[in-house]
């Protein structure tokens, strides 16, 4: 009895330690007000300077080697009160999923009062969702039938690795006998098989679009485009390796060459329709680059192709160790793809995206050949806000 009581007391003390009951000022962060302005708070009485940076702030231009000047989130100062609480209140924010960080005396941190955070490559961000419009409601978990998200390992003989996918199956898949179309969705440089399901809210978007009757029930396959990796950082045989953006064999042809291994695995493992009319591929940035070259090197594989802020250019990135043949004769391969009459070739790009000119150059070539495509131009740059929009616009067009 005494031992049990001591154990319970110890557990309670630990719980109180974790919850910090009654310790210091009691404030919330972020605190969303009725007009959608947001107050961000940080308890740091000893700090000399506290700032916040996030995609809810006006952008700033920064110079990035190899890319010139690109857009980056703005930065503002927080103000300290007499209790040691630093605060900043934003303007009323439009409905959107926002990410942000705080900086304490120059050290970037997540908001310690916000339990919701997310990893993007090697950075952690705090997350804030402002609802209130039809599009942002697609990013929420609503009271609709839900699909299943699974982490699935497959053998890639071409890569010589066992690798991992994230696979979404729609509500009712487990109890159904029907066959489904498949949408292959690819991430950008430094991302992995978790990027679209976490940062992109892909499962929530598909759940809601399908429930609203705006999208066909489909299987969504989210790959890891870093062919040298088994899976996302921390979940491979390499252990807790530090994530990095620049990985080997990302844009030199190896991933594109090995992609048929993914299709073969999915069509062997899941109840799917195994023809071009029921396969789609799309990706953001590097994933758009991959989607373009996978589709034009396999012109009978995909009836639907989507390029989201795609890293398209004429440069052949394969070298002696890669597969330069993947990138050879790009324009002739594009012509071949269009001669096969794809049901949809879709391009989306932000007006201030550093890849805007590259995408315009691709469009100019398509126009010169009278190749039909769908184009969406949005505000903003190379950001997840745009890529979620593109997913919500592209998906309802599939498999009609």
Model-derived features with residue positions:
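Bacterial N-terminal signal peptides
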Residues: 1-11
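A general sequence property marking short-to-moderate contiguous segments
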Residues: 15-25
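Non-catalytic cap/lid and distal C-terminal segments of serine-dependent acyl enzymes
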Residues: 18-20, 32-400
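Short beta-strand segments of immunoglobulin-like
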Residues: 27-31
């Amino acid at each position: 009895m005494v031992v049990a009581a001591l154990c319970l007391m110890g557990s309670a003390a630990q719980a109180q330690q974790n919850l910090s009951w009654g310790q210091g000022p009691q404030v919330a962060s972020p605190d969303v007000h009725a007009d959608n302005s947001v107050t961000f708070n940080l308890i740091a009485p000893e700090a000399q300077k506290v700032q916040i940076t996030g995609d809810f702030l006006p952008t700033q231009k920064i110079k990035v080697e190899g890319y010139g000047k690109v857009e980056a989130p703005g930065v503002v100062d927080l103000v300290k009160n007499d209790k040691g609480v630093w605060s900043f209140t934003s303007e009323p924010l439009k409905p959107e999923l926002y990410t942000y960080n705080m900086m304490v005396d120059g050290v970037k941190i997540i908001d310690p009062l916000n339990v919701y955070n997310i990893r993007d490559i090697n950075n952690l961000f705090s997350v804030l969702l402002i609802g209130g419009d039809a599009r942002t409601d697609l990013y929420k978990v609503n009271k609709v039938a839900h699909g299943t998200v699974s982490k699935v390992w497959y053998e890639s003989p071409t890569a010589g690795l066992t690798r991992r996918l994230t696979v979404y199956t729609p509500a009712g898949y487990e109890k159904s006998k029907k066959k489904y179309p498949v949408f292959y969705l690819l991430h950008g440089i430094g991302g992995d098989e978790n990027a679209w399901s976490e940062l992109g809210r892909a499962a929530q978007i598909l759940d809601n679009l399908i429930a609203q009757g705006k999208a066909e029930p489909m299987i969504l396959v989210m790959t890891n485009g870093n062919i040298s990796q088994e899976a996302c950082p921390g979940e491979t045989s390499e252990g807790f390796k530090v994530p990095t953006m620049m990985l080997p064999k990302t844009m030199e042809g190896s991933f594109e060459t090995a992609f048929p291994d993914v299709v073969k695995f999915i069509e062997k493992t899941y109840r799917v329709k195994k023809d071009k009319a029921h396969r789609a591929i799309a990706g953001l940035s590097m994933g758009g680059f991959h989607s373009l070259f996978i589709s034009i090197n396999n012109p009978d594989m995909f009836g639907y192709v989507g390029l989201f802020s795609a890293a398209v250019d004429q440069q052949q990135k394969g070298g002696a160790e890669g597969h330069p043949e993947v990138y050879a004769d790009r324009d002739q391969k594009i012509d071949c793809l269009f001669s096969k009459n794809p049901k949809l070739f879709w391009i989306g790009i932000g007006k201030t995206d550093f890849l805007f000119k590259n995408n315009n150059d691709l469009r100019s070539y398509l126009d010169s050949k009278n190749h039909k495509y769908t184009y969406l131009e949005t505000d903003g740059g190379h950001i997840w806000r745009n890529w979620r929009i593109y997913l919500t616009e592209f998906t309802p067009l599939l498999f009609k």
